[in-house]
C-alpha cells in the first residue's frame, strides 16, 4: 500500500528517514524480499537530514526518533561515534550496539560511520521485538537498516554537494592566570615556582578548526538497466592541534532486469579509507593544559620541555601533543542480489556478499611524557561471507491478503590480529616507525589472535490481512552458532504482532477530520551473542612467563578462562502496544507506544573458587534486566500554503531501566555477584587517594547509579581551610566513606527523558530549519570541578578562578559535586535558498549557511552536560577532566544537480 505523506511524523516501532513516497510497513531482511509488518513505519522528509556539516552518516540520525540515542566519544567530539543505543542498555557484558544492515549486508556502527551521508537514501530503525526477532540472535539491541542510493533509470545525471566549515572554541575552563596564580600563592604564604611567563595553555593547544565535505555522483540508464557511481571526501582538522581525520569513500551500483522484467539483479561495490590522527592520552592533555603552572612556558627552552617536578600528574601540554594514536581503517564490500518471479505469486531471491575490513593502530608516547617512552603497533583484519536464499509468496483473494517467506542463511567470519609493543626509546624523532630500535619489549606485549565463527539460520514469516484493516504477522527464526555451548547450539526466536486500521471501519470513514487511526501490539524474542567469543566455552591458556629448562628458555602457560559448555544466548523478550492518529489530512499526527522488555540468561563474569575451578572467573548466563518506556511523537503543520509552510516535529521518550538479578544456579552451585559493585571512579591525573568510587551497579536499581556520601555543607577545620561536612547516615558515630558505608543512592547517570525536535519553515525559495535535542532526569558528577577546586594540590597544580576564595582542601567524593544533567541543545540552525534557474544543463542549485552546536541551555556548571550518559563503562555519568573544548561550527553549503 503506497502512502504519500506530506507531513512528517515519527513512529515508535520503526522509523524511516526517506523521501515522502515509499512502500510503508515493510522492512528488508539482509537481502531477503520485503515483508509487510503490522507495526508502524513513518516517513521523514529529506529536509530533516540537512544539518550543515555532517561528520558522518549517523549525525543525520541523532535526535530524529524517540528511543534512539547517538552519542559522541566522551573524550572528544571530532567525528567517530562511540555508541548508538536503541531503547537503552539491555546487557552488562553482551554488547548494546544495534545490528547495522547496509544494503542487506551485516555491518556495524563503525562501518556505518564511514559511509558518506549523501549516499544514504533511508534509515530504518527497528525497535520492537516483533521486527527485531527477524534478525534472531543479533537483534536484541535493535536494528538499523541502511538503504543507499541507486540509479533512477531517468537518463544521465550528475550531482555535487559540498560544505566548508570553520570551528571556533567558545567555552573553556576558567583557570587562574599568572597574576592570579601568584597572588593566591602569596596570600596563603605558599612556595611556588615563577618562570616569568603568562601562558594560557588551553588556548595554546587549540586552533581554529576546519572541515570540508565534497560529494560527486553519476547515474544513468533506463528502468531496465541503470547504474550509479559516487565519490565522497571529508577532511577535518579539529580545534585541537595535530588532531584530525580524512575519509575517502567510493561506491558503484548496477541494476539489471531481464526476461520481461521477471529477473532483477543488483550488484554493488563499496570501499572506504579512513585515517585518523589522535592523541594517546586526551585526559592527560586537557588536565595538563588546565592544571599546569601558568608562569611556565608552552614551548621548549634550550631544547628541553620545562616540567614541574612537584606536579607529577601533569606534563607540558606541548609535549603531550607529540603523542600519537593513529588509526587507518579500510573497508571493502561487494554484494549481488538476484530475484526471479517464478509466477505472479511466487518468487525466489538469492543474495551473496563479501566484506573485508582492516584496522591499523599505531601509538607513540615520547620520553618527554613517559619515562622510557612507549611504542605500539597493531593490525586487525576481518573477512565476512554472507549468503541467503528465500522463497516469497503473495496472494490476494476477496477480503484476504497473504504474504509468506521461508529462507535460509549462512554467515562465516574470519578475524585475525597481530600486535606488539616496546619501550626504552632512544630517539623520539622516529615516532612509531622504528620499533626495532627500542631497548625492550614487555612480556606479553607481542601477541596475535584468530577466530572463525559461523552462523547458520532458517527463518519464516507469514503476514495475513483481512478486509485490508486487520493484520496478523507471525515470524520465526532459528540461529545455530559455533560460539555457544554444545547443548545450546540452536536458538529460536519467535514473534507475533497485530494491528487494526480503524480508519477503514465504516463508522470512522465519515469522520473526515481523522485521516489515520491505527492500533498495534506485538510480542517477540531476540538474542544477543555480543559477550561470547569463539573460544569462550573452552578452557583457554596463554603464556605467563619464561623459565629455563635444560638451559633453554621455555615459555610457561597459565589458565585465563574457565570452560562453560552451558553458555548460551542472552534472550530479550519485548511486548509493545501503540497507536497512530492523523488528523486533518495528516497535518497533525500523534503517535504513542509503551514497551516492556526483559533480558534473561544475561551474561556476567562471576568470582569462583580455585579449586574446583581452574581460573577465578566464570562467564555464565544467570542475570536479568528490564527496560520499559513510553515514546510519543508529534508532528504539526500549522501553515501549509503554496508559498509558505511551517512544520513542527517533536519526539519524547521516557525510559526506566532496572537490574533485576545477578544470581542463580550453575551446575548445582549457587552463584551470585555482589549486590553493590563500583563501575566508575575519579582516577588518573590529579586524583590522589581518597574514596573515589562514584557510579555503581546495584541490584534493584537502574544500571549506573550514583552511590555517594551526603555533604551537609562546607566547614572550617580551624586552620583557615575548608572541608566537606559529610553526614553520618547510619548514625553510628563515625563517618565511613567506603563502599557500603555512609553512602546513599543519589540519582542515576542515564536520562529518564530524551527529546528530539525539528522546526522547519519555507517561504517561496527560502527555507529555515532548527534542530534541537535534550535529556532530562539524570545527574552528572562534576569531577572536574572537584579536582580543580581542591586547594590541597595548589600551587603545584593550577585551580579554577574562585577556588582560592573557597580554600577547600578536600578531594573526597560526595554529592556536593553531583549536579542536574538536564539540557536542551540547539544542535543546528540552517538557512538555505533554492536559486531559481531555467531548466537546462543545471536542473537545480541550492546554497545554504549553517551553525552547528548553536547553544546549550543547562544549569550544569561544567563545560558541557553532553558527556557519556549511555555507555556502560568507567566514564558513565562522570565529568572527570576529559571534556573536549566546546566549539561551534559555521559552514557554507552548495548543492548542484545536472
At which residue positions do the language-model features occur?
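C-terminal beta-barrel architecture of Gram-negative outer-membrane proteins
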Residues: 733-734, 767-827
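Short aromatic-centered micro-motifs
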Residues: 100, 299, 464, 705, ...
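Extracellular/periplasmic, surface-exposed regions of secreted and cell-surface proteins
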Residues: 96-97, 209-212, 247, 253-259, ...
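Short, small/polar-rich motifs associated with maturation and membrane association
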Residues: 1-259, 263-272, 306, 317, ...
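Acidic, glycine-rich flexible loop segments
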Residues: 283-317
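Conserved small-residue
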Residues: 159-196, 419-421, 620, 637-747, ...
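Glycine-rich, aromatic-lined ligand/substrate-binding cores of catalytic
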Residues: 748-780
Amino acid at each position: 500500500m503506497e502512502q504519500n505523506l506530506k507531513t512528517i511524523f515519527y513512529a515508535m516501532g520503526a522509523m524511516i528517514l526517506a523521501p515522502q513516497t515509499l512502500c510503508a510497513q515493510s522492512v528488508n531482511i539482509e537481502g531477503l524480499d520485503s515483508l509487510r509488518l503490522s507495526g508502524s513505519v513513518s516517513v521523514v522528509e529529506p529536509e530533516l537530514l540537512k544539518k550543515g556539516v555532517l561528520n558522518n552518516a549517523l549525525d543525520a540520525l541523532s535526535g530524529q526518533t524517540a528511543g534512539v540515542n547517538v552519542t559522541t566519544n566522551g573524550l572528544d567530539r571530532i567525528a567517530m561515534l562511540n555508541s548508538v543505543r536503541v531503547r537503552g542498555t539491555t546487557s552488562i557484558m553482551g554488547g548494546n550496539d544495534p545490528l547495522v544492515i547496509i544494503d542487506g549486508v551485516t555491518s556495524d556502527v563503525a562501518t556505518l560511520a564511514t559511509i558518506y551521508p549523501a549516499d544514504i537514501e533511508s534509515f530504518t530503525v527497528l525497535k520492537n521485538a516483533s521486527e527485531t526477532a527477524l534478525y534472531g540472535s543479533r537483534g536484541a539491541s535493535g536494528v538499523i537498516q541502511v538503504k543507499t542510493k541507486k540509479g533512477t533509470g531517468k537518463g544521465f545525471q550528475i550531482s555535487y554537494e559540498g560544505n566548508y566549515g570553520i570551528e571556533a572554541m567558545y567555552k573553556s575552563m576558567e583557570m587562574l592566570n599568572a597574576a592570579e596564580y601568584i597572588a593566591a600563592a602569596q596570600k596563603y604564604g605558599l612556595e611556588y615556582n615563577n618562570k616569568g611567563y603568562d601562558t594560557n595553555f588551553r588556548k595554546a593547544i587549540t586552533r581554529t578548526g576546519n572541515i570540508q565535505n565534497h560529494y560527486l555522483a553519476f547515474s544513468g540508464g533506463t528502468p531496465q538497466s541503470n547504474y550509479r557511481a559516487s565519490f565522497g571526501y571529508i577532511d577535518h582538522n579539529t580545534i585541537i592541534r595535530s588532531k584530525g581525520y580524512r575519509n575517502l569513500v567510493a561506491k558503484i551500483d548496477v541494476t539489471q532486469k531481464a526476461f520481461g522484467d521477471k529477473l532483477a539483479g543488483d550488484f554493488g561495490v563499496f570501499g572506504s579509507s579512513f585515517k585518523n590522527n589522535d592523541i594517546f592520552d586526551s585526559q592527560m592533555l586537557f588536565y595538563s593544559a588546565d592544571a599546569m603552572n601558568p608562569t611556565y612556558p608552552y614551548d621548549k627552552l634550550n631544547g628541553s620541555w620545562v616540567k614541574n617536578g612537584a606536579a607529577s600528574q601533569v606534563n607540558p601540554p606541548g609535549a603531550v601533543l607529540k603523542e600519537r594514536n593513529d588509526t587507518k581503517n579500510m573497508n571493502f564490500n561487494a554484494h549481488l542480489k538476484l530475484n526471479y518471479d517464478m509466477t505472479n505469486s511466487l518468487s525466489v531471491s538469492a543474495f551473496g556478499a563479501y566484506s573485508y575490513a582492516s584496522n591499523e593502530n599505531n601509538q607513540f608516547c615520547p620520553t618527554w611524557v613517559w619515562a622510557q617512552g612507549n611504542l605500539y603497533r597493531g593490525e586487525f583484519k576481518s573477512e565476512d561471507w554472507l549468503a541467503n536464499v528465500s522463497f516469497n509468496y503473495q496472494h490476494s483473494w476477496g477480503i484476504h491478503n497473504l504474504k509468506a517467506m521461508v529462507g535460509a542463511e549462512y554467515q562465516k567470519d574470519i578475524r585475525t590480529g597481530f600486535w606488539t609493543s616496546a619501550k626504552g626509546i632512544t630517539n623520539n624523532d622516529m615516532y612509531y616507525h622504528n620499533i626495532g630500535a627500542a631497548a625492550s619489549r614487555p612480556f606479553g606485549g607481542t601477541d596475535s589472535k584468530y577466530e572463525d565463527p559461523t552462523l547458520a539460520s532458517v527463518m519464516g514469516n507469514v503476514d495475513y490481512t483481512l478486509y485490508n484493516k486487520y493484520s496478523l504477522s507471525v515470524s520465526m527464526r532459528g540461529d545455530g552458532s559455533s560460539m555457544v555451548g554444545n547443548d545450546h547450539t540452536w536458538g529460536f526466536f519467535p514473534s507475533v504482532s497485530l494491528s487494526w486500521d480503524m480508519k477503514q471501519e465504516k463508522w470512522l470513514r465519515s469522520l473526515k477530520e481523522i485521516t489515520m487511526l491505527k492500533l498495534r501490539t506485538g510480542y517477540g524474542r531476540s538474542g544477543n551473542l555480543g559477550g561470547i567469543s569463539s573460544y569462550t566455552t573452552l578452557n583457554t591458556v596463554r603464556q605467563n612467563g619464561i623459565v629455563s629448562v635444560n638451559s633453554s628458555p621455555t615459555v610457561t602457560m597459565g589458565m585465563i578462562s574457565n570452560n562453560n559448555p552451558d553458555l548460551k544466548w542472552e534472550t530479550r523478550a519485548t511486548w509493545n502496544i501503540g497507536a497512530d492518529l492523523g488528523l486533518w489530512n495528516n497535518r497533525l499526527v500523534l503517535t504513542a507506544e509503551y514497551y516492556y522488555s526483559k533480558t534473561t540468561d544475561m551474561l556476567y563474569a562471576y568470582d569462583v573458587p580455585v579449586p574446583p575451578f581452574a581460573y577465578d572467573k566464570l562467564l555464565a548466563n544467570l542475570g536479568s534486566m528490564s527496560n520499559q518506556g513510553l515514546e510519543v511523537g508529534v508532528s504539526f503543520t500549522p501553515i501549509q500554503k503554496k508559498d509558505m509552510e511551517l512544520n513542527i516535529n517533536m519526539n519524547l521518550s521516557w525510559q526506566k531501566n532496572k537490574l533485576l538479578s545477578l544470581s542463580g544456579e550453575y551446575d548445582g552451585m549457587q552463584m551470585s555477584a555482589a549486590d553493590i559493585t563500583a563501575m566508575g571512579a575519579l582516577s588518573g591525573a590529579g586524583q590522589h587517594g581518597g574514596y573515589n568510587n562514584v557510579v555503581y551497579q546495584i541490584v534493584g536499581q537502574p544500571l549506573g547509579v550514583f552511590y555517594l556520601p551526603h555533604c551537609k555543607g562546607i566547614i572550617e577545620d580551624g586552620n583557615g581551610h575548608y572541608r566537606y561536612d559529610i553526614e553520618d547516615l547510619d548514625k553510628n558515630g563515625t563517618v565511613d566513606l567506603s563502599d557500603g558505608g555512609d553512602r546513599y543512592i543519589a540519582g542515576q547517570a542515564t536520562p529518564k527523558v530524551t527529546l528530539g525536535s525539528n522546526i522547519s519553515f519555507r517561504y517561496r525559495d527560502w527555507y529555515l530549519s532548527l534542530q534541537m535535542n535534550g535529556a532530562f532526569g539524570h545527574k552528572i558528577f562534576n569531577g572536574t570541578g572537584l579536582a580543580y577546586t581542591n586547594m590541597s594540590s595548589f600551587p603545584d597544580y593550577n585551580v579554577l578562578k574562585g577556588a582560592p576564595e573557597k580554600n577547600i582542601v578536600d578531594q573526597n567524593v560526595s554529592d556536593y559535586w553531583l549536579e542536574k544533567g538536564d539540557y536542551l541543545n540547539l544542535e543546528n540552525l540552517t538557512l538555505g535558498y533554492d536559486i531559481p534557474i531555467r531548466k537546462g544543463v543545471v536542473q537545480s542549485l541550492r546554497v545554504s549557511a549553517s551553525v552547528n552546536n548553536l547553544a546549550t541551555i543547562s544549569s550544569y556548571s561544567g563545560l558541557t552536560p553532553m558527556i557519556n550518559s549511555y555507555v556502560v563503562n568507567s566514564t558513565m555519568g562522570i565529568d572527570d577532566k576529559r571534556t573536549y573544548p566546546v566549539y561551534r561550527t559555521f559552514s557554507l553549503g552548495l548543492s548542484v544537480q545536472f
